[in-house]
């Protein structure tokens, strides 16, 4: 089967996250950079203005920025390494514009200071309770196996109002070959199933998997679909991951990933966009 894969003109960008706002697509990626496009998903232009007011405690690792619109403001969920603790952690920044500047509203890392935490994402449940779902990175767990975690957020998104809970381990699925949890993204289906896209490594490389909550809640029991959403086994040539789903200006859903996960010859990690569809309570690529 020949799948449609849109290759962007961006030469190198990891963890691409796309939103559609006022007829314009915005793509954010590691390094705290932003690109935009209004007429094509292939051709993007770098936004040259300052995107983020860099927090004073930031010592690099400006990873996986996501931008979510909430209560009329734009919130960036992202990662950086702390000068004080030397650990990576998640933070939340706010702006009036999708082009920034985004200013930190949390008191530094919002995630536990004794953890390395990355890839925070945003979800609002059926009771309008905001959550951060994030990675408890394998480098700071007692057995070098990554976890997915979640905590409730305050209404203003400045702090946790619950202790983080563990959702699942990286080594739970039968296909998983590494202890990596990466790139969580929440998706609610039309029949109210709560899915999570996330990445680990199968026998062919970096991939995108689907987990689902058995009771439709963040703190429910999470089970793993056997069929991967994206794998080199299916698509050939390159692996890829850190997926998210967005809807374009015409209402078509797409999966955004970086592919490959590491350079292959002259091919760098670049944003790749693939049409996806919701069918029978899951996400599929045709």
Regions found by a protein language model. Give the residues of each.
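Carbohydrate-active catalytic/glycan-binding domains of CAZyme proteins
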Residues: 1-286
């Amino acid at each position: 089967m020949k799948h449609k894969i849109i290759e962007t003109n961006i030469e190198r960008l990891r963890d691409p996250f796309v939103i559609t706002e006022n007829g314009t697509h915005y793509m954010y990626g590691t390094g705290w950079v932003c690109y935009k496009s209004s007429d094509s998903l292939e051709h993007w232009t770098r936004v040259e203005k300052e995107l983020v007011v860099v927090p004073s405690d930031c010592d690099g690792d400006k990873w996986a920025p996501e931008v979510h619109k909430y209560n009329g403001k734009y919130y960036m969920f992202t990662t950086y390494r702390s000068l004080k603790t030397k650990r990576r952690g998640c933070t939340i920044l706010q702006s009036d514009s999708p082009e920034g500047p985004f200013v930190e509203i949390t008191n530094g890392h919002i995630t536990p200071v004794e953890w390395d935490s990355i890839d925070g994402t945003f979800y609002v449940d059926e009771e309008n309770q905001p959550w951060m779902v994030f990675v408890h990175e394998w480098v700071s767990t007692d057995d070098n196996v990554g976890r997915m975690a979640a905590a409730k957020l305050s209404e203003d998104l400045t702090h946790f109002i619950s202790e983080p809970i563990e959702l699942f381990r990286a080594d739970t699925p039968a296909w998983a070959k590494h202890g990596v949890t990466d790139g969580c993204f929440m998706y609610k289906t039309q029949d109210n199933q709560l899915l999570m896209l996330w990445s680990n490594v199968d026998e062919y490389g970096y991939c995108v998997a689907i987990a689902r909550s058995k009771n439709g809640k963040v703190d429910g029991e999470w089970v793993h679909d056997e069929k991967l959403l994206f794998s080199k086994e299916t698509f050939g040539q390159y692996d890829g991951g850190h997926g998210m789903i967005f809807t374009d200006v015409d209402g078509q859903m797409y999966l955004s990933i970086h592919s490959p996960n590491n350079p292959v010859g002259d091919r760098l990690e670049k944003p790749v966009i693939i049409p996806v569809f919701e069918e029978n309570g899951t996400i599929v690529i045709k």
